[in-house]
């Protein structure tokens, strides 16, 4: 072989500078792959914490706007309280001495 283009030297030994460069390059790639895999697993486990860091804080306009589900639950609670008060008023208007009874007849 002529010149320094080949892997083998003049005495038949392997040029170790090429192998050292190859080993360093593969070690760097291996480290990059392992670090990126570790970061991916961390991001997968702590998704909410990471999203909280990058989320924009809410403005005053969105704070004044009520949450839809909170509004629904408050409306439902108000309806239940109104029905309860109506039933209590109805119970107090009925005389207490009359017992509700149902008569069944078999024919």
Swiss-Prot record:
Keyword line: Membrane, Transmembrane, Transmembrane helix
Top-level lineage group: Eukaryota
Pfam families associated with the record: UPF0697 (PF15117)
Bilayer topology: Single-pass membrane protein
Keyword field contains Metal-binding: no
S-S pairs: none
Membrane-crossing residue ranges in chain numbering: 25-43
Keyword Transmembrane helix: yes
Compartments where found: Membrane
CC annotations in GO: membrane
Family: Belongs to the SMIM19 family.
Protein name in the entry: Small integral membrane protein 19
Organism: Homo sapiens
């Amino acid at each position: 072989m002529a010149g320094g283009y080949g892997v083998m030297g003049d005495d038949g030994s392997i040029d170790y500078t090429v192998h050292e460069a190859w080993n360093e390059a593969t070690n760097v790639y291996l480290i990059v792959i392992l670090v990126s895999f570790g970061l991916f697993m961390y991001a997968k486990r702590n998704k909410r914490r990471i999203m909280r860091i990058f989320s924009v804080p809410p403005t005053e306009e969105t704070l004044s706007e009520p949450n839809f589900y909170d509004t629904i639950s408050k409306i439902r609670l108000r309806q239940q309280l109104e029905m309860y008060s109506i039933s209590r008023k109805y119970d107090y208007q009925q005389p207490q001495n009359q017992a509700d009874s149902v008569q069944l007849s078999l024919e």
